[in-house]
Amino acid sequence: MSFRENLARARGHIVMILALILGLVLVLWLETLGEPQPDASAGPDMMQPFDDLDPLPLAIRGESSDRDMEHARIAWTYFQNNVDEGTGLANSVHAYPSTTMWETGSYVVAILSAERLGLIDRPEAHDRLDRAIASLSDLRLFQDVLPNKAYHTRTLQLVDYGNQPVELGLGWSALDVARIVGTMGLVQRNHPELAPAVEALLNGWQLDQMVDGGELIGTNVSDGNIRRNQEGRVGYEQYAAKAMMLFGFDVFRAYDVSGDLMVQRVEGQPIPVDTRLHRATTPAFVVSEPYLFDGLEFGFDDRSHRFATAIYRAQEGRFAETGKLTAVTESHLHEAPYFAYSTVWGGGAPWAVMTFQGERIDSRRTLATKAAFGWDALFGTDYTARLVDAVEQFADPAKGWPEGIYEETGAVNGSTTANTNAVVLAALAFKAHGPLVRVAP
């Protein structure tokens, strides 16, 4: 047999031997790379850092101080000034007659909180809620399915983000709709006489259209075309899922984080970060807001309590490291670009401040009023007390609480919004009575 014939017969063995050699070389090379980076992890054991974390105790005090009540009165002033007399809906920003389902949910939270704090009596709370529900029932829906992303608070017209009427609409936001649905659940528990009105409202919305395979689905309009897309990232997604669960919707994938979670270490704390991109281009944002809403409105579950503890501790840790008071979340801005996410982790880096479009604007990092009050209500530490002290001086008794303080300049971020003033009220109600889902005695 010739050499060539022997070589042909042996070629399978040669290929196998070469593969084994290459595999050995690859293993040896990988071993030279060392351990994975200590600040990031992903995989099946990603919950382990949170299992090892002791959640901070909640700080429900059982009563309101005189100072608490003064803070609450200032926050309620915003809604006294910004609710349309005809429709009973609240402006999302001071003197700007536009709202979303998210901000309308904030107004509902503000009413329930003001009632618990004794700022308004039960008949006034009932009347305000009844009027708001009636106007929500009168809304022209996007494609006759679900509420549009924005409405004019006086005319109830579908509008764009410039508050200009738009015939087709912008689509619906699954997160925003879930928030108003969740607050309707709070209304049913706290004002059962309004349960029939709530049921009639929600039965008029095709809520099943925003749930598909256990996920939350929103829509966008682009060049006249309507596109459906999964909505929500870790934090906001689970908060919205809890809201939908109040009405029996199967949102198991939205509530589950296991397939989309990675851990980034910030100030030594494990921070829960979504592996999915924001708007398909930018690493996802981690802010305080969804955890504040979850704790103040629904009460933490074990997982969200641990996530919230880590996110809070990272902010406290940044102060210990830099001396800069830190309470970060999403905020309106008093100047362009008018909205930013001050993150614990965002855009692939710690403490990044991001626009919705994914541009970085760290000069607009804000010590957020709502984060200061929210964390103080939930955890009540010496550090959270310092946060409240820092923002207290900027309260406007005639207007409400502003968004906060710009870290870089110390100047006030003078935008005044429904969200911030609602969170202040919810925080102060929580201090005295616990989460809103718990029916007040």
Report the location of each language-model feature:
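Ser/Thr/Asn(+Pro)-rich, low-complexity disordered segments
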Residues: 2-441
